[in-house]
Swiss-Prot record, chain B:
CDD domains: bacterial_phosphagen_kinase. The keyword Kinase applies. HAMAP family: Prot_Arg_kinase. This is Protein-arginine kinase. The gene is mcsB. It comes from Desulforamulus reducens (strain ATCC BAA-1160 / DSM 100696 / MI-1) (Desulfotomaculum reducens). Belongs to the ATP:guanido phosphotransferase family.
Length: 170, 357
């Protein structure tokens, strides 16, 4: 086999790349291989984030990153996006996808972020119970501190406030 | 300043070298990804719905209370701008290159000093950005947070209790917050410490990129460091982490500069003055060469080797010498060779005007 690039010397380096289920193979002689590697990243184009994520999601759905046959077709009722589409683009079609298709991606979120529970900002007007849950979280931290510094009166009032809020959640 | 004036002026508020730690940190940026409840995400959004999102955002930014809190915000549709003007907004970091595709679906909200910008229908319905000079991540977050609160008065966001703000890409869910600092690290590069530093950053859950985002090279020794994780941490935790790391980088870069200045004074002075000489007198100049020389010159300014040059001029010249900006100033499309000539001319004129001041 001759080198794909110079078509003169025999191919000694065989380079296979799989991105998004498409397989690319290059057969190069050692001279061309080292030139390409030294010259630029063009030899192994930088994986963009979406391709990478699509690969991860695909792997998650199918249990394999190179399987190319039909994916299980769970579909979002709201926007019609299928798992296959999500796996291909790395993007969800709408916010409903998170509760429809997203359930199955939850472990993946944990893998990306190291956590799967939001602890940050909550929209004031539409946050609903999330806002109360956040306040409880903050109060529980304050309670710990109050106990630590033996401010028991303060601790008691924080505890009452937490109880009150927890009732609202039920 | 109107949007038309914004694209005619190479100077942005965030280029002022007035912020804290500005000898190393060029700028700070906070971006919040938000989506409207009930609409498909932009990559599958039809024209009619895209229009509805644009209208919703237009009325949300026009609220009196929001304008009172953060100043005058105005939405322009991408179709109202020429292709060169759109490209200039990219070169000024006010919109991403993705915004250039399908302009009929997209819009941009700008405050006239360019500190606040909101991309509409990019990867998410809203990308609220705040950009300030130097290390001002907290200030950026406060401002973005205020804009976010203001928009939320009218707009129903896609939000879930457990996953937080829902975004089209799962790497952004939770806080939807991406904070970044742009650093000038010439001494860490020269002393070959940069690779060790970059490896450490990736272990801390941070991403490093070049000046123009994902996949771009760190030309001109400019590096963008940003958080990777957006879910499971509070906004304040994310910001604090990044500030701590940025300050560490500042300390290390300064130490490397001092060492270079002490141990290789002649080499450094030679490098700086050669860069200054080329920028001041060369007749053609490629974009990459410009970035490298401006980086050397800025190092000279920061080390006190060259005096009388405002540090902000370096970023101003970088923006000025980008392809679309050159075409805009010239008033005509330029081929790469003509661009190199015109770039050298503009830089020369700007630097000579400084020495005459």
């Amino acid at each position: 086999m001759l080198c794909d690039r110079c078509q003169k010397r025999p191919a000694e380096v065989h380079f296979t790349q799989i991105i998004n289920n498409s397989k690319k193979q290059m057969n190069l002689c050692s001279t061309c291989a080292s030139e390409l590697q030294a010259g630029s990243l063009g030899f192994a184009p930088q994986l963009n984030l979406h391709d990478f994520l699509a690969g991860l999601i695909n792997h998650h759905f199918t249990g394999s990153s190179i399987q190319t046959n039909a994916l299980p077709q769970m579909r979002c009722e709201k926007c019609g996006s299928t798992e296959a589409q999500v796996a291909k683009t790395g993007l969800f079609g709408c916010s409903e996808c998170y509760s429809q298709i997203g359930e199955r991606v939850r472990p993946l979120l944990k893998r990306i972020h190291g956590s799967s529970i939001h602890t940050g900002k909550v929209p004031k007007r539409t946050g609903g119970t999330a806002l109360i849950a956040k306040e409880i979280r903050i109060l529980k931290n304050q309670l710990q501190n109050a106990i630590k510094y033996e401010e028991f009166e303060e601790a008691a009032s924080i505890r009452d406030r937490i109880k009150e809020l927890e009732q609202k959640l039920q | 300043m109107s949007l038309k004036e914004t694209v005619s002026n190479p100077y942005s508020k965030w280029l002022e070298a007035t912020g804290p730690e500005n000898d190393v940190i060029i700028s700070s940026r906070v971006r919040l990804a938000r989506n409207l409840m009930g609409y498909p995400f932009p990559h599958v959004l039809g024209h009619e719905n895209a229009d509805k999102v644009l209208y919703a955002v237009q009325s949300a930014v026009a609220q009196k209370s929001l304008q009172e809190a953060v100043g005058n915000l105005e939405l322009s549709r991408m179709t109202e701008l020429s292709s060169i003007e759109r490209q200039i907004l990219v070169e000024k970091h006010l919109i991403s290159p993705d915004m250039l595709e399908q302009p009929e679906k997209r819009g941009v909200v700008l405050r006239d000093d360019e500190v606040i910008s909101i991309m509409v229908n990019e990867e998410d319905h809203l990308r609220i950005q705040c950009l300030l000079p130097g290390l001002q991540l907290k200030e950026c977050w406060d401002l973005a947070n205020t804009v976010d609160d203001g928009l939320e008065q009218i707009i129903d966001y896609a939000f879930a209790k457990e996953q937080g703000y829902l975004t089209s890409c799962p790497t952004n869910i939770g806080t939807g917050l991406r904070a970044s600092v742009m650093l000038h690290l010439p001494a860490l590069v020269m002393t070959r410490q940069i690779n060790a530093v970059l490896t450490t950053l990736s272990k801390l859950g941070l991403t490093v990129r070049g000046l123009y985002g994902e996949g771009t090279q760190a030309t001109g020794n400019l590096f963008q460091v940003s958080n990777q994780v957006t879910l499971g941490l509070t906004e304040e935790e994310i910001i604090d982490n990044l500030i701590t790391v940025a300050l560490q980088l500042v300390t290390q870069e300064r130490a490397a500069r001092r060492a270079l200045h002490k141990e290789q004074l002649h080499q450094i002075e030679d490098k700086v003055w050669r860069a200054y000489g080329l920028l001041k007198y060369a007749r053609t100049m490629t974009s990459n060469e410009t970035m490298t020389l401006l980086s050397d010159m800025r190092l000279g300014v920061d080390l006190g080797v060259i005096t009388g040059i405002p540090p902000g001029i370096i970023m101003e010249l970088i923006i000025l010498s980008r392809p679309a900006f050159l075409s805009k100033v010239k008033g005509a499309d330029l081929n790469p060779y003509q661009r190199d000539i015109f770039r050298a001319t503009l830089i020369r004129e700007r630097l000579n005007s400084l020495s005459n001041e």
